[in-house]
Amino acid sequence: MDPSSLVQGLVAGCIYALTGLTLNIIYRPTNVFNFAQGALVMIGAMIFAWLVAGGRMSWYLAALIAVGCVGLISLAIWLVAISPIIRRPTGHGAGWIISTLAVTMILEDAVGKLVGPDPRIVPPPPPMSMNFHRILGADVSSYQVTIVVFMLLAIIAMGWFYAQRTGAAILAIAEDRDAAMLRGIDPGRLGLLSCIVGGAMAGFVGILAAPMMYASVSLGPTLLIRGFEAVAIGGTGSVRGAVIGGCILGIFEAVGGSLMSPGYQSAVTFALLLLILLVRPQGLFGTTRARVI
Protein backbone atom coordinates (compact mmCIF):
# COMPACT_ATOMS: atom_id res chain seq x y z
CA MET A 1 0.00 0.00 0.00
CA ASP A 2 1.48 3.33 -1.08
CA PRO A 3 1.78 5.70 1.92
CA SER A 4 0.94 8.60 -0.39
CA SER A 5 -2.51 7.10 -1.01
CA LEU A 6 -3.12 6.96 2.74
CA VAL A 7 -2.15 10.62 3.07
CA GLN A 8 -4.48 11.58 0.22
CA GLY A 9 -7.25 9.54 1.81
CA LEU A 10 -6.71 11.20 5.19
CA VAL A 11 -6.80 14.68 3.66
CA ALA A 12 -9.95 13.88 1.68
CA GLY A 13 -11.39 12.44 4.89
CA CYS A 14 -10.75 15.77 6.62
CA ILE A 15 -12.81 17.53 3.95
CA TYR A 16 -15.60 14.95 4.37
CA ALA A 17 -15.42 15.37 8.15
CA LEU A 18 -15.69 19.15 7.91
CA THR A 19 -18.70 18.78 5.61
CA GLY A 20 -20.26 16.40 8.11
CA LEU A 21 -19.66 18.91 10.90
CA THR A 22 -21.62 21.55 8.98
CA LEU A 23 -24.55 19.13 8.81
CA ASN A 24 -24.30 18.40 12.54
CA ILE A 25 -24.15 22.09 13.48
CA ILE A 26 -27.63 22.62 12.04
CA TYR A 27 -29.01 19.23 13.07
CA ARG A 28 -28.38 19.59 16.79
CA PRO A 29 -30.88 22.38 17.58
CA THR A 30 -33.36 21.58 14.79
CA ASN A 31 -33.33 17.81 14.13
CA VAL A 32 -33.10 18.80 10.47
CA PHE A 33 -30.47 17.77 7.95
CA ASN A 34 -30.06 20.70 5.60
CA PHE A 35 -29.45 18.94 2.30
CA ALA A 36 -28.64 22.32 0.76
CA GLN A 37 -25.29 22.24 2.58
CA GLY A 38 -23.67 20.64 -0.46
CA ALA A 39 -24.88 23.49 -2.64
CA LEU A 40 -23.51 25.98 -0.10
CA VAL A 41 -20.11 24.27 -0.23
CA MET A 42 -20.18 24.55 -4.01
CA ILE A 43 -21.26 28.20 -3.97
CA GLY A 44 -18.48 29.08 -1.54
CA ALA A 45 -15.94 27.49 -3.86
CA MET A 46 -17.39 29.16 -6.97
CA ILE A 47 -17.59 32.66 -5.45
CA PHE A 48 -14.06 32.27 -4.18
CA ALA A 49 -12.77 31.05 -7.55
CA TRP A 50 -14.46 33.94 -9.33
CA LEU A 51 -12.99 36.52 -6.94
CA VAL A 52 -9.47 35.08 -7.00
CA ALA A 53 -9.17 34.08 -10.66
CA GLY A 54 -11.47 36.64 -12.28
CA GLY A 55 -11.31 39.55 -9.85
CA ARG A 56 -7.63 39.12 -9.01
CA MET A 57 -8.48 39.58 -5.35
CA SER A 58 -6.20 38.44 -2.56
CA TRP A 59 -6.82 34.91 -1.29
CA TYR A 60 -7.74 35.90 2.25
CA LEU A 61 -10.05 38.79 1.35
CA ALA A 62 -11.81 36.60 -1.23
CA ALA A 63 -12.25 33.87 1.38
CA LEU A 64 -13.79 36.34 3.83
CA ILE A 65 -16.24 37.66 1.22
CA ALA A 66 -17.19 34.16 0.03
CA VAL A 67 -17.82 32.93 3.58
CA GLY A 68 -19.96 35.98 4.35
CA CYS A 69 -22.01 35.57 1.16
CA VAL A 70 -22.66 31.89 1.85
CA GLY A 71 -23.67 32.69 5.43
CA LEU A 72 -26.28 35.13 4.09
CA ILE A 73 -27.55 32.56 1.58
CA SER A 74 -27.85 30.05 4.42
CA LEU A 75 -29.87 32.61 6.39
CA ALA A 76 -32.24 32.95 3.42
CA ILE A 77 -32.58 29.16 3.23
CA TRP A 78 -33.50 29.06 6.91
CA LEU A 79 -36.14 31.77 6.51
CA VAL A 80 -37.67 30.31 3.35
CA ALA A 81 -37.20 26.53 3.40
CA ILE A 82 -36.63 25.37 6.98
CA SER A 83 -38.13 27.65 9.64
CA PRO A 84 -41.68 27.86 8.15
CA ILE A 85 -41.84 24.06 8.05
CA ILE A 86 -40.46 23.17 11.49
CA ARG A 87 -42.66 25.84 13.12
CA ARG A 88 -45.89 24.26 11.92
CA PRO A 89 -48.09 23.53 14.96
CA THR A 90 -49.24 20.25 13.44
CA GLY A 91 -45.67 18.97 13.08
CA HIS A 92 -43.37 19.11 10.11
CA GLY A 93 -42.74 15.42 9.50
CA ALA A 94 -40.08 15.19 6.83
CA GLY A 95 -41.15 18.25 4.86
CA TRP A 96 -37.70 19.77 5.32
CA ILE A 97 -36.27 17.00 3.13
CA ILE A 98 -38.32 18.16 0.16
CA SER A 99 -37.76 21.87 0.81
CA THR A 100 -33.97 21.66 1.25
CA LEU A 101 -33.58 19.34 -1.73
CA ALA A 102 -35.64 21.79 -3.80
CA VAL A 103 -33.34 24.62 -2.73
CA THR A 104 -30.35 22.46 -3.69
CA MET A 105 -31.68 21.88 -7.19
CA ILE A 106 -32.51 25.57 -7.65
CA LEU A 107 -29.07 26.73 -6.51
CA GLU A 108 -27.14 24.16 -8.53
CA ASP A 109 -29.16 24.86 -11.66
CA ALA A 110 -28.73 28.61 -11.25
CA VAL A 111 -24.97 28.38 -10.71
CA GLY A 112 -24.63 25.93 -13.60
CA LYS A 113 -26.38 28.32 -15.97
CA LEU A 114 -24.38 31.33 -14.75
CA VAL A 115 -20.87 29.90 -14.82
CA GLY A 116 -21.17 26.67 -16.82
CA PRO A 117 -20.11 23.13 -15.94
CA ASP A 118 -16.37 23.55 -16.46
CA PRO A 119 -14.27 23.17 -13.29
CA ARG A 120 -12.14 26.09 -12.19
CA ILE A 121 -8.60 25.74 -10.89
CA VAL A 122 -8.07 27.55 -7.59
CA PRO A 123 -4.61 28.20 -6.15
CA PRO A 124 -3.87 27.41 -2.49
CA PRO A 125 -3.25 30.34 -0.14
CA PRO A 126 0.28 31.71 -0.08
CA PRO A 127 2.74 30.58 1.13
CA MET A 128 1.14 27.12 0.82
CA SER A 129 1.46 25.10 -2.38
CA MET A 130 0.43 21.83 -3.97
CA ASN A 131 4.07 20.86 -4.57
CA PHE A 132 4.86 17.53 -2.98
CA HIS A 133 7.73 16.75 -0.63
CA ARG A 134 8.88 13.26 0.32
CA ILE A 135 8.25 12.69 4.04
CA LEU A 136 8.61 9.20 5.57
CA GLY A 137 8.03 7.59 2.19
CA ALA A 138 4.88 9.58 1.40
CA ASP A 139 4.37 12.54 -0.93
CA VAL A 140 2.94 15.37 1.16
CA SER A 141 2.20 18.97 0.18
CA SER A 142 2.09 21.94 2.52
CA TYR A 143 -1.55 22.52 1.56
CA GLN A 144 -2.50 19.00 2.64
CA VAL A 145 -0.98 19.72 6.03
CA THR A 146 -2.97 22.96 6.14
CA ILE A 147 -6.26 21.10 5.63
CA VAL A 148 -5.48 18.71 8.49
CA VAL A 149 -4.59 21.66 10.72
CA PHE A 150 -7.84 23.43 9.86
CA MET A 151 -9.82 20.33 10.78
CA LEU A 152 -8.07 20.17 14.15
CA LEU A 153 -8.78 23.86 14.70
CA ALA A 154 -12.45 23.27 13.82
CA ILE A 155 -12.65 20.52 16.45
CA ILE A 156 -11.12 22.79 19.09
CA ALA A 157 -13.40 25.70 18.12
CA MET A 158 -16.53 23.55 18.29
CA GLY A 159 -15.48 22.09 21.63
CA TRP A 160 -15.00 25.61 22.97
CA PHE A 161 -18.31 26.82 21.52
CA TYR A 162 -20.38 24.01 23.01
CA ALA A 163 -18.78 24.73 26.40
CA GLN A 164 -20.16 28.30 26.32
CA ARG A 165 -23.64 29.41 27.32
CA THR A 166 -25.08 29.43 23.79
CA GLY A 167 -23.49 26.11 22.91
CA ALA A 168 -24.76 24.55 26.12
CA ALA A 169 -28.27 25.76 25.24
CA ILE A 170 -27.98 24.05 21.85
CA LEU A 171 -26.91 20.82 23.54
CA ALA A 172 -29.86 21.13 25.93
CA ILE A 173 -32.27 21.41 23.00
CA ALA A 174 -30.67 18.40 21.35
CA GLU A 175 -31.04 16.40 24.58
CA ASP A 176 -34.62 17.35 25.47
CA ARG A 177 -36.32 20.03 23.41
CA ASP A 178 -39.41 20.37 25.60
CA ALA A 179 -37.45 20.65 28.85
CA ALA A 180 -35.13 23.23 27.29
CA MET A 181 -38.10 25.34 26.18
CA LEU A 182 -39.50 25.21 29.71
CA ARG A 183 -36.20 26.72 30.87
CA GLY A 184 -36.70 29.65 28.52
CA ILE A 185 -34.44 28.52 25.67
CA ASP A 186 -35.66 29.65 22.24
CA PRO A 187 -35.08 26.86 19.66
CA GLY A 188 -35.91 29.16 16.76
CA ARG A 189 -33.23 31.70 17.63
CA LEU A 190 -30.60 29.02 18.16
CA GLY A 191 -31.66 27.27 14.96
CA LEU A 192 -31.20 30.53 13.06
CA LEU A 193 -27.75 31.04 14.59
CA SER A 194 -26.72 27.46 13.83
CA CYS A 195 -27.90 27.76 10.24
CA ILE A 196 -25.83 30.90 9.66
CA VAL A 197 -22.74 29.41 11.31
CA GLY A 198 -23.19 26.07 9.52
CA GLY A 199 -23.66 27.83 6.19
CA ALA A 200 -20.60 30.03 6.65
CA MET A 201 -18.57 26.98 7.59
CA ALA A 202 -19.87 25.16 4.50
CA GLY A 203 -18.61 28.04 2.38
CA PHE A 204 -15.21 27.77 4.03
CA VAL A 205 -15.15 24.01 3.39
CA GLY A 206 -15.74 24.75 -0.29
CA ILE A 207 -12.80 27.15 -0.27
CA LEU A 208 -10.56 24.53 1.36
CA ALA A 209 -11.68 21.82 -1.06
CA ALA A 210 -11.37 23.90 -4.24
CA PRO A 211 -7.56 23.73 -4.69
CA MET A 212 -7.70 19.92 -4.41
CA MET A 213 -11.04 19.05 -6.03
CA TYR A 214 -11.53 22.13 -8.25
CA ALA A 215 -14.47 24.52 -8.08
CA SER A 216 -17.39 23.13 -10.07
CA VAL A 217 -21.11 22.51 -9.79
CA SER A 218 -20.45 18.81 -9.18
CA LEU A 219 -18.44 19.59 -6.03
CA GLY A 220 -21.62 20.15 -4.00
CA PRO A 221 -23.36 16.79 -4.53
CA THR A 222 -20.09 14.91 -4.07
CA LEU A 223 -19.26 16.47 -0.71
CA LEU A 224 -22.88 16.36 0.48
CA ILE A 225 -22.97 12.59 -0.03
CA ARG A 226 -19.57 12.08 1.59
CA GLY A 227 -20.41 14.39 4.48
CA PHE A 228 -23.69 12.59 5.11
CA GLU A 229 -21.87 9.26 5.00
CA ALA A 230 -19.36 10.58 7.56
CA VAL A 231 -22.20 11.60 9.89
CA ALA A 232 -23.99 8.27 9.44
CA ILE A 233 -20.81 6.29 10.11
CA GLY A 234 -19.76 8.34 13.13
CA GLY A 235 -23.16 8.98 14.66
CA THR A 236 -25.72 11.73 14.17
CA GLY A 237 -24.97 14.87 16.16
CA SER A 238 -21.54 13.71 17.32
CA VAL A 239 -18.56 15.97 16.59
CA ARG A 240 -16.12 13.17 17.31
CA GLY A 241 -18.19 10.79 15.20
CA ALA A 242 -18.26 13.09 12.16
CA VAL A 243 -14.49 13.59 12.34
CA ILE A 244 -13.60 9.93 12.78
CA GLY A 245 -16.28 8.86 10.31
CA GLY A 246 -14.95 11.24 7.67
CA CYS A 247 -11.35 10.11 8.16
CA ILE A 248 -12.33 6.43 8.01
CA LEU A 249 -14.33 7.13 4.86
CA GLY A 250 -11.48 8.96 3.15
CA ILE A 251 -8.86 6.34 3.99
CA PHE A 252 -11.18 3.49 3.01
CA GLU A 253 -11.91 5.26 -0.27
CA ALA A 254 -8.19 5.69 -0.98
CA VAL A 255 -7.41 2.06 -0.15
CA GLY A 256 -10.30 0.84 -2.30
CA GLY A 257 -9.20 3.05 -5.18
CA SER A 258 -5.62 1.75 -5.02
CA LEU A 259 -6.62 -1.92 -4.84
CA MET A 260 -9.42 -1.72 -7.40
CA SER A 261 -10.50 0.52 -10.24
CA PRO A 262 -11.24 4.13 -9.14
CA GLY A 263 -14.71 3.64 -10.56
CA TYR A 264 -15.51 1.37 -7.60
CA GLN A 265 -14.69 3.99 -4.95
CA SER A 266 -18.32 5.00 -4.39
CA ALA A 267 -19.41 1.38 -4.18
CA VAL A 268 -16.68 0.68 -1.63
CA THR A 269 -17.68 3.59 0.60
CA PHE A 270 -21.37 2.70 0.47
CA ALA A 271 -20.50 -0.91 1.32
CA LEU A 272 -18.58 0.36 4.35
CA LEU A 273 -21.55 2.51 5.39
CA LEU A 274 -23.96 -0.39 5.02
CA LEU A 275 -21.72 -2.72 7.03
CA ILE A 276 -21.36 -0.27 9.92
CA LEU A 277 -25.07 0.54 10.03
CA LEU A 278 -25.94 -3.16 10.07
CA VAL A 279 -23.74 -3.63 13.13
CA ARG A 280 -24.44 -0.27 14.82
CA PRO A 281 -27.51 1.49 13.36
CA GLN A 282 -26.77 4.58 15.49
CA GLY A 283 -23.23 4.89 14.12
CA LEU A 284 -19.90 4.34 15.84
CA PHE A 285 -20.36 7.11 18.42
CA GLY A 286 -24.09 7.70 18.23
CA THR A 287 -26.38 6.97 21.15
CA THR A 288 -29.89 5.64 21.41
CA ARG A 289 -32.24 7.14 23.98
CA ALA A 290 -35.52 5.80 25.22
CA ARG A 291 -37.97 8.48 26.25
CA VAL A 292 -40.74 7.87 28.78
CA ILE A 293 -44.03 9.54 27.90
Where are these regions (language model features)?
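Inter-helical junctions in multi-pass inner-membrane proteins, predominant
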Residues: 1-9, 161-167, 194-231, 255-265
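Membrane-interfacial amphipathic/re-entrant helices at transmembrane-helix boundaries
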Residues: 1-19, 47, 60-62, 89-97, ...
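Short, non-helical or kinked segments that cap or interrupt transmembrane helices
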Residues: 25-44, 59, 90-95, 169, ...
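Short loop segments and helix-boundary regions at transmembrane helix junctions
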Residues: 29-33, 62, 72-118, 163-165, ...
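Membrane-embedded helix boundary and interhelical linker motif in transport proteins
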Residues: 29-80
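Transmembrane helix-bundle core of multi-pass membrane transporters
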Residues: 84-85, 92-163, 190, 255, ...
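Cytosolic-side transmembrane-helix boundaries in multi-pass membrane proteins
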Residues: 119, 175-182, 186-189, 259-293
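Helix-loop-helix "hairpin" substructures at the membrane interface of multi-pass membrane proteins
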Residues: 136-215, 239-245
